[in-house]
UniProtKB/Swiss-Prot annotation:
This is Acrylyl-CoA reductase AcuI. The zinc-binding residues of the alcohol dehydrogenase family are not conserved. The gene is acuI. Belongs to the zinc-containing alcohol dehydrogenase family. Acrylyl-CoA reductase subfamily. GO terms for cellular component: cytoplasm. The keyword NADP applies. Its EC number is 1.3.1.84.
Amino acid sequence: MRAVLIEKSDDTQSVSVTELAEDQLPEGDVLVDVAYSTLNYKDALAITGKAPVVRRFPMVPGIDFTGTVAQSSHADFKPGDRVILNGWGVGEKHWGGLAERARVRGDWLVPLPAPLDLRQAAMIGTAGYTAMLCVLALERHGVVPGNGEIVVSGAAGGVGSVATTLLAAKGYEVAAVTGRASEAEYLRGLGAASVIDRNELTGKVRPLGQERWAGGIDVAGSTVLANMLSMMKYRGVVAACGLAAGMDLPASVAPFILRGMTLAGVDSVMCPKTDRLAAWARLASDLDPAKLEEMTTELPFSEVIETAPKFLDGTVRGRIVIPVTP
């Protein structure tokens, strides 16, 4: 079976597209014929070796996939079932989706919800699923469309594109943040009410800035998140799910104790299955298939390795889906 394989010898990492035998797959109670995988920021870090994402070598990357069950000893799945996998350390500690077959734990799988097909579910992928977890976090904390604008950082990326689309479809006014002025038309096409230059959120952080937004979804961390927090309206809510700008957070407690705001952490990797099912049900019902197509690029399997560095220099738009099985 064809696979992307990351290997390490001493301190040198190498990545190749190679052929593997099925008996090399790790343990698991479900064997899946992978139809589609995707390329995410974490996959790019793994493939390029720019961060210690991979915990075991050799490793097949790919933090998500969609496909059809080939064999199963798990009570919830049988051959022929169509399934989705996101997270659970797949592509980091357990071989992932950038291979024609994957053997995983059935507890990690989610049944494909109607009316999505396998390609659409992959187009949504971990980025879209994470975006929905963020939207659900805002809703859970009482943020409604009438409260004011919702700011979304990294809006032209995978999480940001889906978040912008989902929020706009529900009637929220979205302020889309991007470092690429050329993406303004794309973002407005997804439903953004306004487009903000990222530089507005990368400057010096004040304990309290001007009250601008009722809520936010942040993929960046660092000064971007800190500035976002300082500019929330009274009882605003920010859902944080990424660290593209850095793991630090140079903020103060002022927005929390003077404006009563909430910072909601969103983890898509170890998220409980009940929350996953809820997120995927909403994605199946709320996300416009036409908008999903608009934000997605299909990439040949053979180009995965050479494309990964583009994530790290910020030139990737939206989602990248990879047909795995020829």
